[in-house]
Design a protein with these regions (language model features):
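Catalytic core of pol beta-like nucleotidyltransferases
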Residues: 1-20, 28-34, 43-129
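Short, well-ordered beta-strand segments
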Residues: 39-41
Length: 129
C-alpha cells in the first residue's frame, strides 16, 4: 500500500471523531506520481476539515484534500463509491452503513442528475452560456 496512505491510516488510528475515512483518486487506483495529492473522503461530524487536511498534509509531506462524505455531489459520490478504499473506521459497520446509504442515494439521484444535465446542455445549445 502507498506509504502516504499508511501514514494517514496511522494518524487516524484511535480517532473516534472521524467515523470513516476512504482514500480515492490516483492513490487508491495506484496511478499516483510521487508528488500527487492524496484524496480522502471522511464522515466526521463536527471536525474542522481544513485543520484535518492540514494535519494530514503535515504528516505525509503531501497535499491532502479532504472532502466531507455528507456534502459530496452525485459525480463525486459515485467516484468515491467506485474507487474508495477504507483507511479508517471508528466502529464495526460504519463503512457498510455508509455504502448502503450512498448506493441508495445514487440509485435515485443519478437518473435525476442525468436528466438535469441533458436539460442544461440543451438550454446552453439553444441560448448560449
Amino acid at each position: 500500500m502507498d506509504p502516504s496512505i499508511l501514514t494517514i491510516r496511522e494518524s487516524l488510528r484511535g480517532r473516534t471523531d472521524v467515523r470513516l475515512a476512504l482514500v480515492f483518486g490516483s492513490r487508491a487506483r495506484g496511478t499516483a506520481m510521487p508528488t500527487s495529492d492524496v484524496d480522502v473522503a471522511v464522515r466526521a461530524p463536527g471536525v474542522d476539515l481544513l485543520r484535518l487536511a492540514a494535519d494530514l498534509s503535515r504528516v505525509t509531506g503531501l497535499e491532502v484534500d479532504v472532502v466531507d462524505l455528507e456534502d459530496a455531489g452525485v459525480p463525486l459520490l459515485g467516484r468515491i463509491v467506485r474507487e474508495g478504499v477504507r483507511i479508517h473506521e471508528a466502529g464495526a459497520g460504519v463503512e457498510a452503513r455508509w455504502r448502503a446509504q450512498a448506493l441508495a442515494d445514487l440509485e435515485t439521484d443519478v437518473p435525476w442528475f442525468a436528466r438535469m444535465r441533458v436539460a442544461w446542455l440543451a438550454r446552453v445549445a439553444a441560448r448560449g452560456i
